Amino acid sequence: MTAAAYRNTLLSLLCLTAGIVDVIGYLSLGHVFTANMTGNIVLLGLAIGKSIQVTVFNSLTALIGFICGVIIATLMVGKAENTLWPSAVTKALALEAFILFVFACLSFYRAFVPVHILIILMSISMGIQTTAAKKLGIAGISSTVLTGTLASLLEDISGRLFFKKQKKTFLRDTVLRALAIILYCVGAIIVALAEPDFYHFIIWVPIVLIFGIMMTAKLKLSGEK
């Protein structure tokens, strides 16, 4: 595999990670999205309209955590070198993995840990991942924001179907966008099947995935321009 192929594969695995984390949050933390802020804002609006205070606080907590994660990652990767895989991206993912590790440990004591602590940990981690993935600049994929990815995918397909000049254009971005959406859904399916019987196993999967991504990036992409 080429260095670019490794990079694209690792980004796709980040989408899988986001799908897993998002559904863990939705099913176990009071029906709140910790990665998909579009859906979370919709839930927030519905909760305000219906005067459901618990959902309002949960959604606001996730939104605040996500914003904090984006700010943290921006400070880490914002001025990083423009290489195939900037070292700052790996450092940001290491911080994300650590935060998810703390979440996983606290999850064993969910009866004693306020749910808002767990929500904010997960949403911070996803905010960090979103900005780190965007730094890679691959087909506009951020790993968590799928609405824009879906729109770009449909534009690609429509252009190839209806405009002759686009029929022979390179398919890489189209394939990556489709793969991002598919893997996000696969992550959601995995958690849906695992909950609740294998909850204490599934929460470690994103950590293992991110660790594997970091190691592969270090071994295969370090120093690549």
Swiss-Prot record:
UniProt keywords, alphabetically: Cell membrane, Membrane, Transmembrane, Transmembrane helix
Major localisation: membrane
Pfam families for this protein: DUF1275
GO CC annotations on file: plasma membrane
Domain of life: Bacteria
Residue runs in coiled coils: none
InterPro entries in the cross-refs: DUF1275 (IPR010699)
Membrane topology: Multi-pass membrane protein
Location of the protein in the cell: Cell membrane
Transmembrane residue ranges: 10-30, 56-76, 99-119, 137-157, 174-194, 197-217
Family from the record: Belongs to the UPF0700 family.
Name by which UniProt lists this protein: UPF0700 transmembrane protein YoaK
Originating species: Bacillus subtilis (strain 168)
